[in-house]
Amino acid sequence: MDSNTVSSFQVDCFLWHVRKQVVDQELGDAPFLDRLRRDQKSLRGRGSTLGLNIEAATHVGKQIVERILKEESDEALKMTMASAPASRYLTDMTIEELSRDWFMLMPKQKVEGPLCIRIDQAIMDKNIMLKANFSVIFDRLETLILLRAFTEEGAIVGEISPLPSLPGHTIEDVKNAIGVLIGGLEWNDNTVRVSKTLQRFAWGSSNENGRPPLTPKQKRKMARTARSKVRRDKMAD
């Protein structure tokens, strides 16, 4: 096992512990708490994969951080903070929408890279909006926290979330997963739109019809889906 992988996990465990103390003292806002919950799942997955105990890793991570801070001068710390790009946290969903439990009548789940896609295949002929909470850096989507599909009535009918066991994903991973989710929902004659905020920071533009540009692979897949559906309709007639 690579030593850097282990030390990175140990430091992440300790930093999570510090952030938990901030929340316990009621000093964290909603996005801070949201990231804390997501990172907890990620750390559990990484710990299981690496075969490391989180509590023991936290103690070692504390020692690593204390050693670095002891060696770090105040001036160097100021320069590091000034040069580091700052990310922003954007929210399409409210805390209630983000944390609400939901159930699927006809569940379908698919893993697309480091992301998990869940769709309720029982939903038909609905207008659906995709909303997401995510971080942005350099005006581009950095990390997806959670994406959910909502009907006009407010019901959750689909979701994209990072896999705790596979931390880290790219903007292309997110766009591909959104394409899969849209295709799955449109299979049942649902009309799907993507929030303008998500369009802007994932695709760099926003369309009035709420549809992001599709990749050539997604276009070919949707064309095959449409042809298959036409054949089924003809057979039914």
UniProtKB/Swiss-Prot annotation:
Residues 1-73 are annotated as: RNA-binding and homodimerization. A motif (Nuclear export signal) lies at residues 137-146. Homodimer. Interacts with host TRIM25 (via coiled coil); this interaction specifically inhibits TRIM25 multimerization and TRIM25-mediated RIGI CARD ubiquitination. Interacts with human EIF2AK2/PKR, CPSF4, IVNS1ABP and PABPN1. Residues 217-237 have a biased composition (Basic residues). Keywords: Eukaryotic host gene expression shutoff by virus, Host cytoplasm, Host gene expression shutoff by virus, Host mRNA suppression by virus, Host nucleus, Host-virus interaction, Inhibition of host innate immune response by virus, Inhibition of host interferon signaling pathway by virus, Inhibition of host PKR by virus, Inhibition of host pre-mRNA processing by virus, Inhibition of host RIG-I by virus, Inhibition of host RLR pathway by virus, Interferon antiviral system evasion, RNA-binding, Ubl conjugation, Viral immunoevasion. Inhibits post-transcriptional processing of cellular pre-mRNA, by binding and inhibiting two cellular proteins that are required for the 3'-end processing of cellular pre-mRNAs: the 30 kDa cleavage and polyadenylation specificity factor/CPSF4 and the poly(A)-binding protein 2/PABPN1. In turn, unprocessed 3' end pre-mRNAs accumulate in the host nucleus and are no longer exported to the cytoplasm. Cellular protein synthesis is thereby shut off very early after virus infection. This is Non-structural protein 1. The dsRNA-binding region is required for suppression of RNA silencing. The gene is NS. InterPro entries: NS1, NS1A, NS1A_effect_dom-like_sf, uS15_NS1_RNA-bd_sf. It holds the Pfam family Flu_NS1. A motif (Nuclear localization signal) lies at residues 34-38. It is found in: Host nucleus; Host cytoplasm. Its main location: host cell. Upon interferon induction, ISGylated via host HERC5; this results in the impairment of NS1 interaction with RNA targets due to its inability to form homodimers and to interact with host EIF2AK2/PKR. GO terms for cellular component: host cell cytoplasm; host cell nucleus. The keyword DNA damage does not apply. It comes from Influenza A virus (strain A/Memphis/1/1971 H3N2). The lineage of its organism: Viruses, Riboviria, Orthornavirae, Negarnaviricota, Polyploviricotina. Residues 205-237 are annotated as: Disordered.
